[in-house]
């Protein structure tokens, strides 16, 4: 990967240390700034449904941004968490904007000749992330954010995902109906060199993923790095294994 294209600015306000995670969407942190009585704690919102056990553990460092809604129960949003390869964006609210950037900049070949981008379109029993109208066909796109890495292998999911399995199954049905279909993987670990479905965490998802790819559903794994207050596109990586016969 040799790209380093600026995607967007994602500012943050303060660093903090994670103390605990009472539930998926709530964290308790100790803020770096102190009051006259010493360090203080805050409740923060975690905008990512994954386990993130390699990033959200007691003692790890976080980047926070002040929430703009004064009526919220949590006054801060978690933007990123510290890892060996730098700060990792773990706020999934940005995934749609990242995907829109990728589509607009045609970083995957299947994004050529797109005439219209329709978000959140219903197909079957699911609502898929995008329907792209092209000059000669239509392309259904489902976006998956990936923050888990083993060595240089990025993998999804980090927890069993019935919803993810259903979405991939719907993409295969879209393909069978005559449309094109794509799984867009947003990898937020810049050391990643390849991607694979996480069979050790969710073997059912891995099997559905494999079946979809072998049937002709396209996969576009894109690597992004969060540096300073900016997100950069680093390039596309392949699938890790040779078990997908259509790649």
Curated annotation (Swiss-Prot):
CDD domains per UniProt: SfsA-like
Single GO MF annotation: DNA binding
Pfam families: SfsA, SfsA_N
InterPro entries from the UniProt entry: SfsA, SfsA_C, SfsA_N
The family this protein is said to belong to: Belongs to the SfsA family.
Protein name: Sugar fermentation stimulation protein homolog
């Amino acid at each position: 990967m040799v790209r380093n294209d600026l995607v967007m600015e994602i500012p943050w306000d303060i660093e903090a240390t994670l103390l605990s995670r009472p539930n998926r969407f709530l964290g308790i942190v100790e803020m770096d700034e102190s009051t006259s009585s010493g360090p203080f704690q805050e409740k923060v919102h975690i905008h990512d449904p994954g386990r993130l056990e390699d990033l959200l553990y007691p003692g790890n460092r976080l980047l926070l941004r002040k929430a703009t809604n004064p009526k919220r129960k949590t006054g801060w949003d978690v933007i990123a968490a510290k890892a060996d390869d730098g700060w990792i964006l773990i706020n999934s609210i940005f995934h749609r904007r990242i995907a829109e950037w990728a589509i607009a900049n045609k970083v995957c070949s299947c994004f050529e000749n797109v005439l219209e981008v329709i978000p959140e379109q219903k197909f079957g029993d699911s609502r898929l992330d995008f329907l792209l109208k092209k000059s000669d066909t239509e392309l259904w796109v489902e976006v998956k954010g990936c923050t888990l890495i083993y060595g240089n292998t990025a993998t999804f999911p980090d927890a069993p995902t019935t919803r993810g399995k259903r979405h991939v199954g719907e993409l295969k049905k879209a393909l069978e109906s005559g449309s094109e279909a794509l799984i867009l993987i947003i990898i937020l670990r810049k050391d990643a060199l390849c991607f694979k479905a996480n069979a050790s965490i969710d073997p059912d998802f891995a099997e559905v993923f494999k079946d979809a790819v072998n049937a002709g559903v396209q996969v576009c794994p894109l690597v992004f790095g969060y540096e300073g207050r900016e997100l950069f596109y680093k390039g596309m990586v392949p699938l890790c294994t040779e078990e997908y016969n259509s790649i």
